[in-house]
Every structure is written in structure tokens, then in C-alpha cells.
Amino acid sequence: MSSRPLLHVRGRILTGPGRDDEVHDDLWIIDGRISFTRPVSGGNSGGPNEPTVLTGWVLPGLVDAHCHVGLDAGGAVDRPTSERQALTDRDAGTLLIRDAGSPADTRWIDEREDLPRLVRAGRHIARTRRYIRNFAHEIEPGDLAAYVRREARRGDGWVKLVGDWIDRAEGDLTPCWPRWAVEEAIAAAHAEGARVTAHCFAEDSLRDLVEAGIDCVEHATGLTEETIPLFAERGVAIVPTLVNIGTFPRLAAGGEAKYPRWAEHMRRLHARRYETVGAARDAGIPIFAGTDAGGSLAHGLIADEVAELVRAGLPTGEALSAASWGARKWLGRPGLTEGAPADLVIYPEDPRVDVRVLAAPRHVVLRGRVVR
């Protein structure tokens, strides 16, 4: 007999962004997997095989495509802290995390059926003294490709570069790598079967990274009329992390006395953040939801990030897809499909009407068990 309960989920099962054939009235969870066929032994007889009934509007487990488990402002954290981070995300409905760089070994999470699934990018790779202390491998351009190969093998199909950061001599954001180095590094990652993403706040690193074949850019606040068409043409995705970009004025205020050019630059990027994301969306650039939790940001903010995407001009269905159906497809993970692992979130109201519903899940089901 299975240790997982038989569950019957009724209401509006949203298997896609809105077509009639993507909305079902119910599904069953049998041995931890989804079925749209009523089980022979489950029914309304009141017998021992009677399913537990859950009702509401149902989405696949949400995706946070930029989230750092195992990291806080000081660097790597211990297992109990990592566990609390993952549980906070889980209880907010995030059941799939693309961990966009962490110095901690979190492989043990894979053995825990009560914690979200992680897609790791290894450890950040940054230029020497050009990133947050204790976060990254800090290296020089000649070593970049070798470190990328190592992190590609350590991760789950992704590698994370730091594409730009403050240059203390210049007093502003500048690219971290010469063009030849990123070309070698991205080719090395692709040869290992990994995709590459990069932290980029400013404008100047973007063209080299995209023309070198990068797959995704984090934050992407420096997109312009010149680079948006290039991203769209190459199909390069962005993860705007708008809840993080919202902290730019505070960061600017803290660094203004020492780096006034950088502070003013950060304020400009912040001021046009919604316009930038809206223009990217209009151009057809793939956009996915990520909170940048870890470091200095709290975990469990995926509902806030989806709401920010709506403020930036994404229609509600697209914003939901950026954190569910579309994000799962992008990461190669199943949604609400026959036979898929039962990772889903149930809400008391329709999130397609108001994405703020995401902030208050009624139930969270992970691997076929109700965990909230």
C-alpha cells in the first residue's frame, strides 16, 4: 500500500494559460502522481479508499527562477538555515527553484521529499574584487572557461556569471569580462551541456554576452532600444527580479558619498524598471519570475514578484506563466500533466483575475502530500 494519500482535487485545474482545453474540473493524485482519470478504488463510498478532497483554483507548483538557497548576506549558511529558507519558499507556493548561484552544498535537499526541487547553477563566478564578499569564485579572465566547466559539472544544467559590477576605479558599473573570455566561457558551458546566465545591472555588458551566445540575463535593468531587439532575435530570456530592483534607491543612498556616479546610475535604472520590462515583453523576450531571495532579500516573495511583473505591463496570464507553466517548460520540468509528480498549489480564488491571490495559498501539495 502507498504511503501517499489518495487525493481528489476539485475546482478549476489550470493546466495552461487560459484556453478552454487547459482548464479541468478535477484531478486525482495517486501514489504521488497526477491523473485525470478517476481511480477504480476511489469514489464516494465512504470506504477506506475514500480520497481526501481539496477544492479551489489550482496551479502547478510555482517557480522562483532566481533564488539563493544556502546563502545569506555573509555567504554560505548552515543546513538548518538553508532548510528554513527552502521551507519559507515552499509555504509560499514555490515548489521549483532555480538556484542562481550558491556557495553552499545543498545536494542534501534532493533527499528531502518535503522540500522544493532545486535546479542549481553552482557557485557564482566573478572577477576578482568585483562582487559581494564570500559569494563567488573571484578569478581573472584567463581562468573563466575552466571555472565554468567545473561549475557546469557541479550544477544542474546552469552556470552563473557576474557580468557587471562596480569598478572602484571608475566609480560606476562596468563589464567584468573581455569579449574573448565570455566567448570561451559560454562555449565551454555549452560543451558541458549547461546553459549560462549572468548578473547584469547596467547597459555595457549586454551586447558582448548575447553575441557570445548567453542563454539568460538576470535583472537586465540595462536593456535599451539597441539591445532589446538583439535579445529578442536570439531568444535570450530575462529574469527581472523586480522585488530586488526595488531596493536600488536604498543601495544608492548607502553608497552615494563614495560612489556618486554609481548611485545616480542605479537610480536611473530603478526609475525606468517597469518601462524596461514592458518594452522587453512587447519585443517578445522570454520573461520569467525570480525574487533574488537569499543574500539580503527574504525568501517567500514569489507572489510579490508576479505582482511586480503585472505592474510592468505583463498581462495577468503571462505573469502567472512566468512563475508556473512557462517557467516549468523553460526549465524542463513538468506541470499539471498526466503522470507528472503532484506538485501543485490550490487557491481560494482565481489568480487569473487578481494575481494577489498568490500571496495566500489554501493548500500546497508537494510530491503528492499536503504540506500546507
Question: Where is each model-derived feature located?
Answer:
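N-terminal metal-binding scaffold of metallo-dependent hydrolase/deaminase domains
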Residues: 1-45, 58-59, 349-354, 369-370
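Divalent metal-coordination and catalytic microenvironments
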Residues: 11, 27, 32, 55, ...
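C-terminal cap of metal-dependent C-N hydrolases
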Residues: 15, 323-326, 338-372
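Divalent-metal coordination cores built from histidine and acidic residues
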Residues: 59, 79-194, 227-229, 234-247, ...
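Active-site core of metal-dependent hydrolases
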Residues: 169-275, 288, 293-296, 313-315, ...
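His/Asp/Glu-enriched, well-ordered alpha-helical/loop segment
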Residues: 191, 270-350
